[in-house]
Amino acid sequence: MVIKELKNAPTPLPEEDGTYKVFVDNGYAQNKIAYWAEVDGTKQLVNFLLPSRAQMGRVNVDVHGRASGVYTVNGSDYTVGEDVRDPETIRSKQYAHSEINCALVMHTLIAAGFSGLKIRLGTGLPFDHYFRNREVDKAFIKKITESLSSECISASGSEMPIIVSHRVYPESTAAAVAFSLDIDSGDFKTFENGLVVIDMGGGTTDITVINRDFTINID
């Protein structure tokens, strides 16, 4: 279910342990979020997107003069919003563990209704950023998970989501799994000749070859 108006976003549905599973595709052009919610009495996967636009400093205020869309990360202020006039350039590998990414991800989570809630977060990385020398780049991934545990404060007073776990996935590979998985049965489709995924994002294009046994060809 795709949500076009945030005011119509359904309430997130918790797991049995009280946590919430949520995935954020924190791309260069857009932040996409997906989570489980109850819609018309049934459990459905819902998603929506927000522009990845943020500017250093306190830029926007509401009609009452209060800072709007402002987040303080490790002592530095960032304004997040579709209408910021001078957005920061975020098309670099370092964006994934930057303060501005932390502000954008937290803004997206709060917009989805996760303020003050315990979440199990998944985020993505371009395929060639996830691997280094044919191995998972664990040091780089550690920087990302640590960056999203940075001190972040909303000027509006909104409670921050509580990230109890955070896993990072190669984006195009996650897309292959999502395409192949039957949500109702939990089974995977089979592909006689494997599967090729082309992920065209706001700043990167990933091509991933998935073999018949769902191993990844990293050549």
Model-derived features: where do they sit?
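Ser/Thr-glycine-rich phosphate-binding loops at phosphate-binding pockets of nucleotides
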Residues: 201-206
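Nucleotide/phosphate-binding catalytic cleft detector across ATP-hydrolyzing
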Residues: 1-197, 214-219
